Amino acid sequence: MLQLKTQFLLVEQYWFKGKKMSALNIKQGTSSQSAYDLRSSHSDNIETHTLAVVVDNEAGVLARVIGLFSGRGYNIESLTVAEFDHEGHRSRITIVTTGTPRVIEQIKAELGRMVPVYQVNDLTVEGPSVERELAIFKVMGLGEIRAEAMRAAEIYRAKVVDSTIDSYTFELTGKSTKIDAFAEMMRPLGLKEIARTGVIALKRE
């Protein structure tokens, strides 16, 4: 797991500094034409898909997956990774990506051809799945604003995980749309910081 955590620092250079992974800002060298150039005449067909990718938990694997996306200009909306099979040294990477149906199929095909990849599942189309994301929110405020933030948190079933005289830190788990909605509600109530894990997902049997 330490190996993948080390690799994850590579992602932070592109993702957690407010930059979206796309052909515009992580394209490397003279890589081939962005896949998103292919969609210019089909912008109304852009879809969002959640992919579950099973890989070896070894040095360099995550960097290779990220390199595939950046080199081809594929977009990453969210990425999470963790070991799930300790004895087999395998990890699951959950990627939320966007593109036309053609681009999505191309992404899955190219991931499937990578040597350290054992399995690629498109959870968006392979039957029902369960998706969740965890986020923590720091909200600053006093008096009525503070009380209003607490009432909003109760509506969304957010937990208070830390509090000071002038702040609350809330924890919320749910679909990304729920996280987004709670963030919008908290903005006028003193929202200062958000930290999000990204989407994790499993196929329902």
What residue spans do the PLM features occupy?
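Acidic, Ala/Val/Gly-enriched low-complexity intrinsically disordered segments
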Residues: 11-12
